Amino acid sequence: MTCCNQQSSQPKTTTNCAESSCYKKTWSDHRGTRIERGCGCPQVKKGIKLECCHTNECNN
């Protein structure tokens, strides 16, 4: 599976993953809205929005 792994508004980059899902985490801090993308579907702390999906590059 191919997942996007760029941070926030960086140019799109991808990585090949062993997992069958991709994630996109979104949260806000003193720098504004932050976005993290990667492989799998991790547990997140309260206040962090998590979207998990199961197709190539679905987390852009």
Swiss-Prot record:
Keywords: Acetylcholine receptor inhibiting toxin, Disulfide bond, Ion channel impairing toxin, Neurotoxin, Postsynaptic neurotoxin, Secreted, Toxin. It is found in: Secreted. Gene3D superfamilies: CD59 (2.10.60.10). It comes from the Eukaryota. Expressed by the venom gland. Binds to muscle nicotinic acetylcholine receptor (nAChR) and inhibit acetylcholine from binding to the receptor, thereby impairing neuromuscular transmission. Belongs to the three-finger toxin family. Short-chain subfamily. Type I alpha-neurotoxin sub-subfamily. This is Short neurotoxin 1. It comes from Hydrophis cyanocinctus (Asian annulated sea snake).
